[in-house]
From Swiss-Prot:
Sequence similarity: Belongs to the RimM family.
Self-association state and partner proteins as the record states: Binds ribosomal protein uS19.
Name of the protein: Ribosome maturation factor RimM
GO biological process: ribosomal small subunit biogenesis; rRNA processing
Amino acid sequence: MKRKQDSKGAGSRGQGAGEKKQGAGGRGQGEKKQKKSPVPSPQSPVPDPDEWLQIGKIVSAQGLSGEVRVYPDSDFPERFEVPGTRWLLRPGQTEPQPIELLHGRYLENKNLYVLQLAGVENRTQSEELRGCMLFVPASDRPELGEDEYHVVDLIGMEVFLQTSGDLVGTVVDVIPAGNDLLEVSLHEPVPSDKKPKTVLIPFVKAIAPVVDLETRRIEITPPPGLLELGSGV
């Protein structure tokens, strides 16, 4: 089974999975006066934040011509390579603003994209965007194939033993690996001064044969010892 990630909402979950999984040489700007970054005013109309999908974070400038490096929180390359409107959220703000993606490319071996955003024409402007998050509307979520799931849909699902129906715990994260791993917070009382125990469960059909998004239920058939292996406090 495969997980696909477009992180949802303005708050970022730990980005190791992020829908998770570009050289540059820019033009010098000489003595030209630097422009401000073209981020629209906070009065621009925006959708409800709960309906946004986070797709990446701007981590640095690239070259001198205004390109930015983006760490992807999405498994869909078209988020970064197909021109069109994206939504940008500055640190400290609560509403993202529309900005146009002109073009983008992938940086091999770095897990980064290089994007050119409309109106960002020099390194000063691109440096001002460091730390900004990129979003698309949740209505733009791509259709997935059989046995593919969005990470945001898996988070919070309850996990049960298929044989007994006993509750194992709740999915709190999805960790990318050769086979993705569900990080499950075990359903058991713990002292108030201790963190809940968690366990990593391979997200493969042999171990997680039932994934029911409507009932928010995952049924597992773990091999002996799996639920104890790697658990901690």
